[in-house]
Swiss-Prot record:
Protein name as it appears in the record: Lipid-A-disaccharide synthase
Annotated source species: Rhodopseudomonas palustris (strain BisB18)
Domain of life: Bacteria
Gene: lpxB
GO BP terms, alphabetized: lipid A biosynthetic process
GO-annotated cellular components: membrane
Pathway info: Bacterial outer membrane biogenesis; LPS lipid A biosynthesis
Gene Ontology molecular function: any one: phospholipid binding
InterPro entries: Glyco_trans_19 (IPR003835)
Family statement: Belongs to the LpxB family.
HAMAP family: LpxB
Chemical reaction(s) catalysed: a lipid X + a UDP-2-N,3-O-bis[(3R)-3-hydroxyacyl]-alpha-D-glucosamine = a lipid A disaccharide + UDP + H(+)
Function recorded in the entry: Condensation of UDP-2,3-diacylglucosamine and 2,3-diacylglucosamine-1-phosphate to form lipid A disaccharide, a precursor of lipid A, a phosphorylated glycolipid that anchors the lipopolysaccharide to the outer membrane of the cell.
Amino acid sequence: MTAVATHAVRKIFLIATEESGDRLGASLMRELRDRLGAAVRFEGVGGRAMAREGLTSLFPIEELSIIGLSAVARRLPTILRHIRTAAHAALQAAPDVLVIIDSPDFTHRVARRVRARDPSIPIVNYVSPTVWAWRPGRAKVMRKYVDHVLALLPFEPDEYRRLQGPPCSYVGHPLTEQIATLRPNPEEQLRRDAAPPVLLVLPGSRRSEIRHHMAVFGEALGLLQAQGVAFELILPTMPHLEALIAEALKHWPLQPRVVVGENDKRAAFRIARAALAKSGTVTLELAVAGVPMVTAYRAGQLEAWIVRRRITSASVILANLVVGENVAPEYLQEECTAPTLAAALRDVLADSPLRQRQLAAFGRIDAIMSTGAQSPSACAADIVLGLLPAAAPALR
């Protein structure tokens, strides 16, 4: 743990524009306050979690919670205005450290503006952009405006060295602190092994993702049922998506049990035998929970064309990348069809070689993702504090 003299008030400027980044930012703020006490001040951009830790956001992050090229194009004037606002505020604050959290299309533009106007401000990038999957040249460019990358995935430091990027340290994924909420107790394990098996369907956490996946997922599950495969279907979602999910389910040939909220989602993970999931962070959650899966991804045609031309990794599935082998089947764009998904689901529900390969790989995940005795936020705080100037004025 890094020791820091607390005779001067340290100013940390943080920028997080998505809910996941907001949670990371809040945990980092708590850890820094534990270390520095009253000798730290926070400014920047964040959501509700960071607000509970005392941050007054420059603007509501909901205005930036968008996905997809068409959505970005529609909101471009707002995005550009907020980039200018955040960069100007960071320069005015003259913080001891600027911490940008995820959302690279936004936060990196802010960081570049800040570095160009005041190179003395250390900049930490918490959550690496996916340079290992596409646009790898970004890593080398980041050296110009990022002093240290805090990686959530254990393979990322090696990728930054290979790509000649800035210093990068694995600080741990927040999921490693939530293992108990994802894994079954003995009673839940009995349900996981019982008939009919519980099958999770996870179509995404954004409106555009749900629109792209719900129809084909419903068709695939209908085919699976028509083939005589028995299962109990559970669809976890969040309150703000409940109405959209309900509307899409009107067109499904079978009806899942819909559970709402993070706690009920975790409870469903603990009893599930298998899952059909849109690729993303949820695949890593499933791997940590020990739930074999079939993964899929569909996007708009323009976005898919651009991504396909630039993708460089052997897999886009986080679970596969972390365990180092392609154990979870992934069906992207035109490969994401109802018959293909149904056939793979039939396999993963049964005691098949596909299922056994996944379970064996997921059994190694604790060792792969371990950070020892320290929490991810503690590891992150060590690096942030290590970048503080040796001496600072009481207030800037």
